[in-house]
Amino acid sequence: MSSRDFSNDLFSINIEENAGCVVSAKVQANPLVTQKCHKEALKTVKKNVVLPGFRKGKAPDNIVESRYSTQVEQELRRLFLRASFEALSQMCDRKPLSPKAVRSSAIDTCNPVNGGSVSFLYEAFPVIPSLPWEQLSLPDPEPVKEISEEDLENGLKNVAYFFATKTPVTRPSQEGDFISLSLYVSKRGDENSTPVAIFENKYFKISEEDMTDSFKARFLNVSTGHRVEEEIGSEDIQSFLNGDLLTFTVNAVIEISSPEMDDEKARQLQAESLEDLKKKLRIQLENQAKEAQHQKRFSDAEDALAQLIDFDLPESLLQEREELLSREKLLNARLVKYCSDSELEEQKQALLEEAKADARKAVKLLFLTQKVFSEKGLSISREELQYMMDVCSRERFGGYPPKDISNEMIQELVLVARDRLTYRKAIEAISSEKKDLEVVPS
């Protein structure tokens, strides 16, 4: 714990810094501050009252204060609290993360004659030391994957699905079929429980590539209408889903018959011939390989930056991200990888440790990328910001945002878009820069 002081002509502030970026602060104001707040409070109350013999808002101050002392006092305290928070945010180098980061605020004293004091407990922005760039360990970029004939053939098979015959069948499902599944969660034995859809009419290919072994075993050799009920034993999953019974329903079993690709089908896909289609497909696969290399480089830069330095992180942000990632990982194991309750229990500790590490990395990078963005003198163009706002808007509202979107929502979209661009540009600067960074072979 460390204690420091800040002051100017109107305020004196003492802060005590604790682990988790938790700061307790005492803000003391001289009488000039409380006198100003009192004057504004009286003016606010006065303009809203009507007294006999006076026009609205024109009653003498002493009469208003005498008759509406409670309202004046409440407004005075509100204004004084706001002024104290503004002083704390402007004068102190451990600024609150946001108004929501204030855990508690208490007015200790507030008097127009004698001044006042306020106590705050809040989470502050972390203190990040200078970044030791000479210690950054970034592996060399991996070579772009070469596209093999096998890759090309697999790509053609995927293209052939465009022309495939999709036939619902009554026979039991078999390898290579698609099945349409719906999954609902409910509360066993609760007559008032209404099943809630986790997904409906979602298509899965019965294959080793697209299904885990346990998931595949459940839906191989089953027919349309088949139902699988599964009790959820994990209390974590029960809590996340608000239920303890999963019900899978097979809506359809679909047989896929894909034709051989030829020149005619290639022309339907805007290619001159099958050979031309293969050339275009190869270019597409090569571009995908380049993007995969870029994403790997981006991920390596994230890891390198996160490992570069350690510093204290805001407690609540860390906890919030850890809870979110823990939920995602446990649900993914249960509903996507289709682990049984016993398998989930075996993996649970490792998954929670993984979530904890990932949460710490994510929160560290949130603040480190802001520092890198500032130190490297990076910038965001108007066009980049508008494009990212459009992306964020589509994610929030779909393809058709509301016409009467509020100013608050626009501001939120701007902040989210700016944060994303800041993060991306900072990481890309690290992944591409050479001259000032130590780059080591992998």
Curated annotation (Swiss-Prot):
GO MF annotation list: peptidyl-prolyl cis-trans isomerase activity
Similarity comment: Belongs to the FKBP-type PPIase family. Tig subfamily.
Compartments where located: Cytoplasm
Source organism of the structure: Chlamydia trachomatis serovar A (strain ATCC VR-571B / DSM 19440 / HAR-13)
Keyword Cell cycle part of the UniProt annotation: yes
EC numbers on record: 5.2.1.8
Domain spans labelled PPIase FKBP-type: 176-259
Gene behind the chain: tig
Gene3D superfamilies per the UniProt record, alphabetical: 3.10.50.40, Trigger factor ribosome-binding domain, Trigger factor, C-terminal domain
Name of the protein in its database record: Trigger factor
GO biological process: cell division; protein folding; protein transport
Entry keywords, A to Z: Cell cycle, Cell division, Chaperone, Cytoplasm, Isomerase, Rotamase
Transmembrane segments: none
Family matches, as Pfam families: Trigger_C (PF05698), Trigger_N (PF05697)
Summary of the function given for this chain in its UniProt record: Involved in protein export. Acts as a chaperone by maintaining the newly synthesized protein in an open conformation. Functions as a peptidyl-prolyl cis-trans isomerase.
